[in-house]
Design a protein with these regions (language model features):
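GST superfamily/GST-like fold recognition
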Residues: 46, 50-55, 98-128, 134-137
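Charged/polar, low-hydrophobicity segments characteristic of intrinsically disordered regions
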Residues: 51, 141-157
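Acidic/histidine-enriched, glycine/proline-rich intrinsically disordered or flexible terminal extensions
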Residues: 150-182
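GST-like domain detector, emphasizing the conserved glutathione-binding G-site
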Residues: 1-75, 79, 171-182
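Surface-exposed helix-capping loop/turn segments at secondary-structure junctions
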Residues: 21-22, 90-101, 142-148
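Amphipathic alpha-helical packing segments from all-alpha helical-bundle domains
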Residues: 74-92
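Short, mixed-charge aromatic SLiMs
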Residues: 37-43, 132-146
Length: 182
């Protein structure tokens, strides 16, 4: 029987349990696991809505729908992004990783989401612990960097193709104009 899962955190939990991953990824200890689950449950309401939705609405929705959004319409996501980064900074100011002193799938999820902020040229200078953690996560997880490099290549190709087919009338997601005002 084929198992089909469509939610990223469900997939991460399943893989951590079914593949014999080291315990730190998704701890057997219920208290530690609850910390990981807590972050994963918060992730979609803060970081995903901040980074993911902002990137989609600002950069890719205009290519798909032909409709642009005003800065005022994007402000909601900028506020969520600022709050999410403050939450990450608070956690990472106390511990090396989001849920303690060992890396977990919560860190992997957050790092992947934040790495996509390259599309909006987000600077993390206001959040030094978060910035250091993200660079550490990227350095320690070469596969993540490799996969994201492939995704950036596909995205740049997508943008270039859209510009070519639509007379260049599009905000380049790799330009400074795509950066949110935090």
């Amino acid at each position: 029987e084929t198992l089909t899962l469509s939610e990223s955190h469900t997939i991460l939990r399943y893989l951590a349990r079914s593949r014999g991953c080291a315990d730190h990824w998704y701890p057997a200890d219920l208290r530690q696991r609850a910390k990981v689950d807590e972050y994963l449950d918060q992730h979609h309401n803060f970081l995903r809505q901040g980074v993911g939705a902002y990137c989609f609405i600002k950069l890719f929705a205009p290519m798909i729908t032909g409709q642009s959004y005003t800065d005022k319409e994007l402000d909601f996501h900028v506020v969520l992004l600022s709050r999410a980064l403050a939450m990450l900074e608070a956690r990472l100011s106390k511990h090396r990783y989001l849920c303690g002193d060992q890396v977990s799938i919560a860190d992997l999820s957050a790092a992947c989401e934040l790495d996509s902020s390259r599309y909006i040229e987000l600077t993390l200078d206001k959040w030094p612990a978060t910035k250091a953690w993200l660079y550490h996560m990227i350095d320690e997880n070469a596969t993540m960097l490799e996969l994201h490099a492939k995704m950036r290549k596909v995205s740049k190709s997508f943008v270039a193709n859209h510009k070519e087919n639509n007379g260049g009338a599009f905000l380049d997601p790799f330009s400074a104009a795509a950066t949110p005002k935090l």
